[in-house]
Each structure stands twice: as structure tokens, then as C-alpha cells.
Design a protein with these regions (language model features):
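Residues that define the transmembrane beta-barrel architecture of outer-membrane proteins
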Residues: 88-95, 138-148, 185-191, 229-237, ...
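Long, hydrophobic/aromatic-enriched structural stretches that serve as scaffold segments
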Residues: 89-157
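Short loop/turn motifs that connect adjacent beta-strands in outer-membrane beta-barrel proteins
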Residues: 39-40, 53-60, 103-112, 156-163, ...
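Outer-membrane beta-barrel translocator domains and adjoining extracellular loop/strand segments
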Residues: 73-81, 124-133, 165-166, 175-183, ...
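Surface-exposed strand-loop-strand hairpins of Gram-negative outer-membrane beta-barrel proteins
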Residues: 40-42, 70-93, 128-140, 182
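Outer membrane beta-barrel transmembrane domains
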Residues: 223-342
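Residues on the lipid-exposed face of transmembrane beta-strands in outer-membrane beta-barrel proteins
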Residues: 53, 65, 96-102, 149-154, ...
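Transmembrane beta-barrel strands of outer-membrane/channel proteins
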Residues: 61-71, 113-121, 165-171, 209-217, ...
């Protein structure tokens, strides 16, 4: 009888622990879903710049095709610690980018306009828990994403530095239905003010230090709970240190290698409500930091280059933590004019 009572006691304690764990998992899951409604990331996806961050295209039309692949299997809380969730968060996007740079100068620099035509994007989210595999959240979607329009870019070039300032806005052209699980777009407008700088550390411009900054502000979005909110502003910094190596003596082929990284922070509170009773400013600010490498193959005379970038996130707060891969190429028409002889 005593053994039976002891067994019953242990069984009830196990049930209580299980209930607590389930309640904890549900709480974290609800918090994650609420946070996603508050847009726990910037509209700008970091990992796109790296080396040559301050160099504008040569006069003419430049086409860039870039594939972005972000994957994460860890979800961090406001302290930067992993939550008891398992699963994955994946984004695959193909950007078709068009630059136009006229030949005339403005304020001593080059003018440029750019548009990232509706991006083909595919995203998926699968959340669960090791202890409760049947309690899970699944979402995902494929389609045309938001459009990045950059109507103003002004850049200057000297012997030791290339730099530009730019303004862009994000048009919510991607599919977005409040509360839907297959959204591709963000559901709101955004504004971005940017600066890119490349410093040549050597006279032959082979060694470079690069820095890109982006300040983004956000418009109002409608949540799946019928309320409206404004995601907090975000700041993104991308950096890189690179070295160009000639593959041929005539410099017709170059290989560029370097260390790159990115940092992104939410710098102001969300405003509005996630639900009619849950203020959006209760969601903690997010941040993420990554480091990796870039390699670029350049054919200067043809205006062609191919690039590959890989960056691993080593810290994330209140958002997923994973890695970013970007690869693709660009071509300029007409072919760039050869640089003047030194």
C-alpha cells in the first residue's frame, strides 16, 4: 500500500511538472507569435553588402541578381538565451536589382537610381518542442515580396575613398493578409536612409575597409487580431575588410577575399497594439550580430562580377539566430571605361 501511495505521489508530481512544462512551452509559443506580429526583424535583410560597400556602379545600366538564403533553428529570448522551442525559420529570396547611373555629374558626384523589382521569396516557419512534438506551429509562403525603390543615390570617388548617401522606400507589394500563415510581404511601408563607404588602405586600391549603415523607419501595419501597430525603427551596420588578388598580370581577372559581418538593432519601441489588450511596446527590442567571409570574382573590363557571402550569427536577442548566405552576379552596360593610367 505504501509503495502504491509513493508511486501515486511520484506520478502526480510528474504530471504537475509536465503541465508546468507544457504551460511554459505554450507561453513561449504565444510570446513568439505575438512578437512576430510586432515584426521582430527589420524590413532590410542584413548580409547584402560586405565588401565594396561604398562603390557605385559605372555609368550605364547595371543588373544584379542576388539570392538570399537565411536559415535559423534557434529562437532566443530577450536575454539572448535559447527558448525551449525547436524547429526552423527559413527565407529564400531572389532579388532582381536594376541600377541606372547617368554620365553627368551632380555636386561633383555620380547620381544613381535603383529598384529591386518584386522579389521572388519563399519562407517557412516550423516551431515545436522536444517534449511536446504534437504541439507545433507551421507557416510558410511563396510569392512576390515587397519592392525596394531607391530614387536617390549620390556618390563621390577619390584616390583613397568611395562613398555615397542614398534614400529608399519599401513598397508593400508582397502578399499580406492580417493573420494569414502564408504572408510573403511585410504589410507596411518603410523608409531607409543609407551611407556606404569604401576606404582604400593601399595605393593600388587592393586592400579595402568597408562600412554600410542603414536607418529604417516603418509605417503602420494591421495585425491578425484586428489591431494596428507600428514596428520600431531599426539600424543596420555592415562591414568588411578585403584584399584583391590579380589572377592575371594584366589585371583582367581579380579575386577578392575578405572578412565581413553585420549588426542590426531595434532602436525604438513598437507602438500600437498586437491585440486590442496587448500593447506592442511590451515586446522586447531585437538585435543580431554576425561574422563571416566573402569571395568575389571580377572581370573589370567586362563589367562583370560574381560573389558569394556567408555569415554566421553569433548573438541574437528576441529573434531567431542562424546564418545568412548571399550569392549572385552583376553586369554593367555599356562596358565600363578603363581607368586612367597611373
Amino acid at each position: 500500500m505504501d509503495q502504491l501511495l509513493e508511486y501515486s505521489k511520484c506520478f502526480m508530481q510528474g504530471v504537475a511538472v509536465g503541465i508546468k512544462r507544457l504551460a511554459c512551452f505554450v507561453g513561449v509559443l504565444v510570446l513568439f507569435v505575438s512578437a512576430s506580429q510586432a515584426q521582430q526583424k527589420g524590413q532590410y535583410i542584413p548580409g547584402q553588402q560586405g565588401l565594396n560597400a561604398g562603390i557605385m556602379p559605372s555609368p550605364g545600366i547595371t543588373y544584379v541578381n542576388m539570392t538570399l538564403d537565411y536559415s535559423a533553428d534557434r529562437f532566443n529570448n530577450a536575454s539572448g538565451n535559447a527558448t525551449p522551442l525547436t524547429g526552423s525559420y527559413d527565407i529564400w529570396a531572389i532579388e532582381n536589382i536594376f541600377y541606372y547611373v547617368p554620365k553627368f555629374k551632380f555636386l561633383g558626384g555620380k547620381l544613381g537610381v535603383m529598384i529591386a523589382a518584386p522579389i521572388v521569396a519563399n519562407g517557412s516557419l516550423t516551431l515545436g518542442a522536444i517534449e511536446f512534438p504534437n504541439a507545433a506551429l507551421n507557416a510558410g509562403g511563396f510569392g512576390i515580396a515587397d519592392t525596394w525603390v531607391q530614387p536617390f543615390t549620390l556618390g563621390w570617388s577619390t584616390k583613397r575613398i568611395d562613398t555615397y548617401v542614398a534614400y529608399a522606400f519599401v513598397a508593400p507589394t508582397g502578399r499580406y493578409t492580417p493573420g494569414a500563415s502564408d504572408n510573403v510581404g511585410s504589410g507596411y511601408w518603410g523608409n531607409d536612409v543609407m551611407n556606404g563607404t569604401t576606404i582604400y588602405l593601399t595605393k593600388n586600391k587592393g586592400t579595402t575597409a568597408n562600412l554600410f549603415t542603414n536607418w529604417e523607419t516603418h509605417g503602420v501595419k494591421t495585425t491578425g487580431f484586428g489591431s494596428v501597430l507600428t514596428p520600431g525603427n531599426a539600424v543596420t551596420i555592415e562591414w568588411g575588410l578585403g584584399q584583391a588578388l590579380p589572377l592575371k598580370k594584366d589585371l583582367s581577372q581579380l579575386l577578392q577575399l575578405g572578412v565581413i559581418g553585420y549588426d542590426q538593432w531595434q532602436v525604438s519601441n513598437n507602438s500600437g497594439f498586437i491585440t486590442p489588450l496587448l500593447p506592442a511596446n511590451l515586446v522586447p527590442h531585437y538585435s543580431v550580430h554576425a561574422i563571416g567571409f566573402q569571395t568575389t570574382y571580377v572581370l573589370p573590363a567586362r563589367g562583370i562580377n560574381f560573389f558569394f557571402k556567408w555569415e554566421k550569427e553569433y548573438q541574437a536577442i528576441a529573434r531567431p539566430q542562424g546564418r545568412t548566405i548571399a550569392f549572385g552576379g552583376s553586369i554593367t552596360f555599356p562596358k565600363p571605361e578603363p581607368p586612367p593610367a597611373p
